Amino acid sequence: MLQQDSNDDTEDVSLFDAEEETTNRPRKAKIRHPVASFFHLFFRVSAIIVYLLCGLLSSSFITCMVTIILLLSCDFWAVKNVTGRLMVGLRWWNHIDEDGKSHWVFESRKESSQENKTVSEAESRIFWLGLIACPVLWVIFAFSALFSFRVKWLAVVIMGVVLQGANLYGYIRCKVRSRKHLTSMATSYFGKQFLRQNTGDDQTS
């Protein structure tokens, strides 16, 4: 079950991530979703390997380009719609309303049982490591292709930067805005507790 809160043009939710867990909750180090964890890295790492070894794997530029783009497209869909939801309980998407206004939506998983409230720390690290490291590599490849005048490969590399950078941007924005939401909730909670305590003291006196 996913919950979402909405503002004018963005929709925020509280972050569901291992590092946001309170200290009194046990953290799970085991991988709870091995298939999702595998495919979270498989497509993006495979695209990088094909790019680096394309000269050895095939002499056809078109074949290598199509293979890399297919792997990047599969990675974009899997990370955006599956692995983020399963591994860290986050999902982002965008929709346009009837007035043509764009709305960013950030969702987090709401678990019913205490057992499922703890995100696997191992999965969280795998998720964020793969999410951040691979786009950085594509940026390096972009500069390398640019300075070595490999113009035909530049379009492929830019595709990698755009597709993987989009997921990175979406999840980081979700993370940052959700932290702000958690901060405002905590401030409101402690403010109510402070007022309640002061009100109780005034009544007893």
Swiss-Prot record:
Residues 1-21 are annotated as: Disordered. This is Golgi apparatus membrane protein TVP23 homolog B. The keyword Cell wall biogenesis/degradation does not apply. The gene is TVP23B. Pfam families: DUF846 (PF05832). It comes from Homo sapiens (Human). Belongs to the TVP23 family. Keywords: Acetylation, Membrane, Transmembrane, Transmembrane helix. It is found in: Membrane. GO terms for cellular component: Golgi membrane. The chain crosses the membrane at residues 34-53, 54-72, 126-146, 152-172. It comes from the Eukaryota. GO terms for biological process: protein secretion; vesicle-mediated transport. The keyword Isomerase does not apply. The modification N-acetylmethionine is found at residue 1. It is a multi-pass membrane protein. InterPro entries: TVP23-like.
